[in-house]
Amino acid sequence: MMEYFYRIYGLRVQSQIPFSEAVPETAGEAEVKIVFGRMPDFLLEAGQKGYGTWTNGFVSAWFRIRDGTQVYVEGGSRITVELSEEPQLLVITSLLLSAGMALVCLQRGEPFFHGSALYTGEQAILLCGESGAGKS
């Protein structure tokens, strides 16, 4: 299987999934790995109950995308992706770069801001706040 290396949020990421939006990086020791695989057995119950998300504090987290693809983020160093029968790759890559990598940063103890940004040529402003605060 093809392996890709990127620099994402300052971390060297080794991925089995290509990201056209990410900055390519030379091969080397990865701080984060994104791999295809099966979800851990203990998450079967969450999926059967119809849950869409599950967390174990800042140690691990799981979420299901609308197309049925499942993502498990653990230890701030690994993202496992189990594709659905009809995966929507654009949605999957977008959520891996946003929610997936945000969970990696949180699990690593990195500060992470929930915000919206505006860019006007030479200047930018970042609006941060809790969900529902009106940043959109």
Where are these regions (language model features)?
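A noncatalytic interaction/capping subdomain that flanks phosphate/NTP-handling catalytic cores
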Residues: M1-E130
